[in-house]
Amino acid sequence: MQRGSVGISTTSTFTLATPLLLESGASLFSVQIAYETYGTLNHDKSNAILVCHALTGDAHAAGHHGDESRPGWWDGVIGPGKAFDTDKYFVICSNVLGGCKGTTGPASQNPDTGKPYGTSFPVVTIRDMVNVQKALIDHLGISQLFAVAGGSMGGMQVLQWMVSYPSMVRKAIAIAATGSSTPQQIAFNEVGRKAITADPAWCGGDYYGKEHPVKGLSLARMVAHITYLSDASMHTKFGRALQDREFRGFDFDTEFQVESYLHHQGTSFTKRFDANSYLYLTKAVDYFDLSVDDSLISGFAPTKATVLIISVTSDWLYPPYQSQEIVSALSANECDVHYCELRSQFGHDAFLIETGQLNYSISRFLDHTLVRDVMNTQVPVISEQSTIAVAARMMITQGVNHLPVLAPDQSLVGIVTSWDIANAVACGYTSLDQIMSSQVITTTGDETIEVAASRMEQHRISALPVIDQAQHVIGLISSDGLSKLIGRGP
C-alpha cells in the first residue's frame, strides 16, 4: 500500500465542565485540552487509537499546519498505509496537562487572578495527564480504545493507561519507556530544572510579560539533548570536527561541531517551549512509578490489554533492561505481551527517527487482531420468553440492530434483527420465536477479524455474536467496524 500524508491538520480544543482533582489533592478549574485527530471514527467507535507525546511534544503528531513545512512529530508512522493507518484507524493526539501547546499549564491564565499561573500551578503527574486524556476520550463518545501508543514520556502515559483504565485499552504500545523513573533519569531532570531556576530572568516563575529565562531553558535543553543521543551517533554525526574553522582557537569560544549543534538545539527550543512547563513536566516524569510495594508485578496486575514493548539498543537514558523489566512484570501477570528492539545507533531519539522499523513492528502488532480485541462487550440481550414489542423497544432505546436471544441458562438460542421486527409488523407476528433466527452464525474471541469478516460476507449478515465454550454471549462484532479495520471499508 502506498504511504501518504494526512494532509492539512488542525488543532481543536475541549474544556472540562467539572473541576479536575489532581493526585496531589489540588483541583484545577476549566481545564482546556488541545488535540488533533486523523482518519475517521467508524460507526461503532471501535477503531480509535490514542497517541501520547513525549516531554516536549504536542498534539500536532501528523500532517501540516497551513503553510508550515515541518510535519507533525510522528508523521512518519501516522497516515495512509503507515503503522497507524488513517484509512483504518481514527488517531487522536492531545497536548498533556501542564504543557504549553494549548492544554492548560503554568503559562495559562488562572481564572481566579486573570494572570498566568506561573508556579502557583499545582504539580501534576503522569496519572493526572492520563485522567485528562480519559475526559477527552469520553467527550468524543469512545468507550474503548483500540490502542494507546507513545514513546518516552508518551510510553509512560501508555503504561499508566494500562493500569488506570484497563478495560478501556485493547492494545498498548510503549516505546523507550520505564515502569519507574530511575535515579539517573531524575538526576538529569534536576540539572535541567536548576539551570532554569538559576537564571535571574526566571523570577520565581513570574516572568510572563517580561524577559523569559531563555539562558536557563537553553542549557536545560542542551543537557537533555545529550541524553537523547548516543556515543555512536555523536561520533558518526560530528566526530571531532571543528565548526567554521580549520584550527583550534585556544580560547573558550564554540569550536567543535557538537558544541554548535547543542547551542542550536538549546536556542531553537526556547522559541517554542515554556520554561515553567519544562519544570512541571520533568517533575511529573520523576514522580512516575507504577510499582506497588516496590513491585512492578503488583503494579501491572490490573492490565488487560495486549501489549507491545519496544526498546532501543543504543538508548542509555531508558536502556533496554528497563523495557525488559516491564515485559517480565506483565508476563508474571500472564498478560499477552510482545517485545522487540529497534536496532539503531540514534539512542533514545530512535523512537522518532527509525520510522521504517517502527512501521514494520507496529503494523504487525496492530494487524494481528483477534475478535476479542475489537468486539463490543456491552451487548443488550433478550430472553426467549420476551415479546416482539419488548424487543422493538429495546432496539430503539439501546440504538442497536441486533439482539441475541438467550435461554433460561443464558446460552444463545437465537438472534433478532431490526429487519425481523419490520417483518413482524408487516406480517402481524406477535411471538418472538416466529421471527428470530435459531441457526445463529457466531464467532469466538480467539478467531482473527479476517475470519470473522469472511464469515459475515459468506452468510451475508452484518453482525456476529461472540460466544464462549458454554455458548454464553460475551460480545458482538459488526461488519461496519471490521470492514474499516481490515481495509475493506470506505
Swiss-Prot record:
PANTHER family: HOMOSERINE O-ACETYLTRANSFERASE (PTHR32268:SF11). SUPFAM superfamilies: alpha/beta-Hydrolases, CBS-domain pair. GO terms for molecular function: homoserine O-acetyltransferase activity. Homodimer. It holds the Pfam family CBS. HAMAP family: MetX_acyltransf. Its EC number is 2.3.1.31. It comes from the Archaea. GO terms for biological process: homoserine metabolic process; methionine biosynthetic process. It comes from Methanosphaerula palustris (strain ATCC BAA-1556 / DSM 19958 / E1-9c). Gene3D superfamilies: 1.10.1740.110, alpha/beta hydrolase (3.40.50.1820), CBS-domain (3.10.580.10). It catalyses: L-homoserine + acetyl-CoA = O-acetyl-L-homoserine + CoA. Keywords: Acyltransferase, Amino-acid biosynthesis, CBS domain, Cytoplasm, Methionine biosynthesis, Repeat, Transferase. Belongs to the AB hydrolase superfamily. MetX family. This is Homoserine O-acetyltransferase. The active site is at residues 152, 315, 348. Pathway: Amino-acid biosynthesis; L-methionine biosynthesis via de novo pathway; O-acetyl-L-homoserine from L-homoserine: step 1/1. Signal peptide: none annotated. Substrate binds at residues 221, 349. Transfers an acetyl group from acetyl-CoA to L-homoserine, forming acetyl-L-homoserine. GO terms for cellular component: cytoplasm. Residues 47-353 form the AB hydrolase-1 domain. It is found in: Cytoplasm. The keyword Cell wall biogenesis/degradation does not apply. Residues 375-432, 436-490 form the CBS domain.
